[in-house]
């Protein structure tokens, strides 16, 4: 089909007239630049740079005076545990800020590190700019986790790749394009920098094809170099734990242990943890702690001021300026006391019933990795017998009761990677939920894919008629590219929430889904549809399945190579580099959510709780997708419009600096698996493949499909696609792959199953590293559950999101003391 289409394109293109009017008629006149000096790039560059400076100035002001946003967040339990060793040498700093040892539960996540030198290095108005360059990878790994280091290393390799591509494109390809004389001989003509300036029979077109293939090789080499340095560490606990689905719902942990120890000689099961439906229990636990905190806050306030506080318990009640029926004020302590008692009772009843809600899943931890791998292989090996393809696991006296023939066995994810509240959503319900969400998402983006359709709708009401003939670069190029950036910035947020409501079992799965969906929609929105002169997916499919598809295909693909078309994407990359990265620094979506939550808070206690709990995990999926979208645009046009590469390099440099700041100062650490990083590598390889596609279409339309340059590009493209498909689907061509990971394990003697001379019993595992929901760990620690070795109620709970957990202050630190600590910290930093 592809050769037939290309041959038709070549024949039609050779006979077609100038497609300029056709392409421009498909767009609105204000979205594509027509005949402006150098495509309006200097004007857009100046405007975006001024906006960038203004946003940086605004950020510096907000950073100095508005510390409530992103300032007083609690760190996760994992972060606290990683810092315990360092805290011994930081007692002087912590004592001055948090009254001695009281820092165990409370640490500031943003802006100023718990390290003394970092507290001193970014106190000034703009000193945070230099602090970004002083942050070392070891400090980022310790503060943000290994995934943040892999992400930043990925960016550095992309920057190195763009440096090489930029030198080749600007130093060689750009002068070659200038040497043509097909377009007007005007120094201000943007078209002279593009491949459209070369005649169809020019032998210099071989240079473009060769460079496209070279860029592909450079991309693969760069990614192999990146992945070879990714010493991805997997915890010993993860490699020794299996996740089993399909167990009998009423199977006991002792029977699971007995099955494995009978079926596999020399097998020791350290722990077998059945899974329960804890979604409602986790919700009640979080609400109960919020109520306790609210009562404590107003109790301390009343003891201090001797005046009972009154609140409006309705959402946004503190914003009401008049008292209406149903919104009367109530006494705060009485309200929170009743609420706490009700939630405690609901929590107690739910906790008693949780053992009656098994999910038919279990996490089983063995004594070493070898036996774990053997068991996994037994349950996943394929032995074809007739029409069935099923492994034959070893049997035991408990096999029939446990329904081992229905088991699905995989390696367990990291405990911090699991959404425990989502495990109850599975099977048909999960697939139906996922289908409905994605259908709604597709319908939404089907019609609202690009900003062109919005402006086209405005044209129907003659809104844009007065500016139609201005031919001003601000009107024709700055606002359309800014609007395109706004839509592309909104898309990851929409896709993220769609992935969130899909209720994935792991954070890695949620991030991978977000990354792939975002990247696909962004490529359509930002690259494919604007290049083809289409305004939405609606028009794309109508054109694709129209009877006149082949007749109009050549003209549509001619739209890609119009002289002024590249200017639109150059200006988009400029907008992403300056305005996009500045907005990432300001974190406007998070700020808006923070303001909404403050408005919905019912009292001062809840507003203070919001201020402490507004930090979230860094969304690697959305960040990878957006960054790879811009990189794909740059690589796709790196040969047809080489002037885009320096601006792409500028985008990546600013993006790297902004992400270093945000990862270290603004977001919670996230624990993911390596699949999210390998998925990003696959998206990188897609960029030079699209560049080959662009050159193939250009060569086919200019010289025909049978021309040597067209055939060479086609053969290279087919071979590349075949190798990629064989590697992704069947695991072949590993030495030609962009992946070259090296897996390392944490230093634990897995074979002897001993750690520091002692066997790794369940009691030796930290609470945050146990395969049990945190709310059940707390129950065991309180003595309300069956108990577990090593569990202690004195250990603070951990959480992955600060909205899930509200930690109580440690012994010896009252709520009033903590409030005074907050106030003194903020006041001290504002006046520095």
From Swiss-Prot:
Cellular localization per UniProt: Cell membrane; Endoplasmic reticulum membrane; Lysosome membrane; Early endosome membrane
Glycosylation sites per record: 462
Endpoints of the signal sequence: none
Family listed: Belongs to the CSC1 (TC 1.A.17) family.
Intervals, Cytoplasmic compartment: 66-145, 228-427, 503-506, 600-619, 667-673, 729-832
Keywords (A to Z) from UniProt: Calcium, Cell membrane, Endoplasmic reticulum, Endosome, Exocytosis, Glycoprotein, Hearing, Ion channel, Ion transport, Lipoprotein, Lysosome, Membrane, Palmitate, Phosphoprotein, Transmembrane, Transmembrane helix, Transport
Naturally occurring in which organism (per UniProt): Mus musculus
Membrane topology: Multi-pass membrane protein
Compositional bias of kind Polar residues: 749-758
Its job: Mechanosensitive cation channel with low conductance and high activation threshold. Osmosensitive cation channel preferentially activated by hypotonic stress. Also acts as a phospholipid scramblase in response to changes in membrane structure: upon changes in membrane curvature and thickness, alters its conformation and translocates phospholipids, such as phosphatidylcholine and sphingomyelin, thereby controlling plasma membrane lipid distribution. Forms a heterodimer with SLC19A2, which mediates phospholipid scramblase activity following Ca(2+) stimulation.
Reactions mediated catalytically: Ca(2+)(in) = Ca(2+)(out); Mg(2+)(in) = Mg(2+)(out); K(+)(in) = K(+)(out); Na(+)(in) = Na(+)(out)
Chain positions found as Phosphoserine: 111, 113-115
Pfam name, any one: RSN1_TM
Gene Ontology molecular function: calcium-activated cation channel activity; mechanosensitive monoatomic cation channel activity; mechanosensitive monoatomic ion channel activity; osmolarity-sensing monoatomic cation channel activity; phosphatidylcholine transfer activity; phospholipid scramblase activity; sphingomyelin transfer activity
Chain segments annotated as transmembrane: 41-65, 146-178, 203-227, 428-457, 473-502, 507-543, 567-599, 620-638, 642-666, 674-702, 708-728
Phenotypic effect of disruption: Most mice die at birth due to impaired alveolar expansion and respiratory failure. Viable knockout mice generated in a mixed background of C57BL/6N and FVB/N show severe necroptosis of outer hair cells (OHCs) in the inner ear and progressive hearing loss. OHCs also fail to exhibit regulatory volume decrease and calcium influx under hypotonic stress. Conditional deletion in excitatory neurons of the subfornical organ leads to impaired hyperosmolarity-induced drinking behavior.
Phenotype for residue 574 to R: Increases calcium influx induced by hypo-osmotic stress
Lipid-linked residues (S-palmitoyl cysteine): 51, 126, 382, 398, 726, 729
Effect recorded for residue 569 to A: Increases calcium influx induced by hypo-osmotic stress
Sequence segments annotated as region (Gating helix): 567-599
Effect of residue 568 to A: Increases calcium influx induced by hypo-osmotic stress
Outcome of swapping residue 485 to A: Decreased phospholipid scramblase activity without affecting localization to the plasma membrane
Protein name: Mechanosensitive cation channel TMEM63B
Effect of residue 144 to S: Decreased palmitoylation, abolished localization to the plasma membrane
Tissue expression as described in the entry: Expressed in cochlear hair cells (at protein level). Highly expressed in the subfornical organ of the brain. Expressed in small intestine.
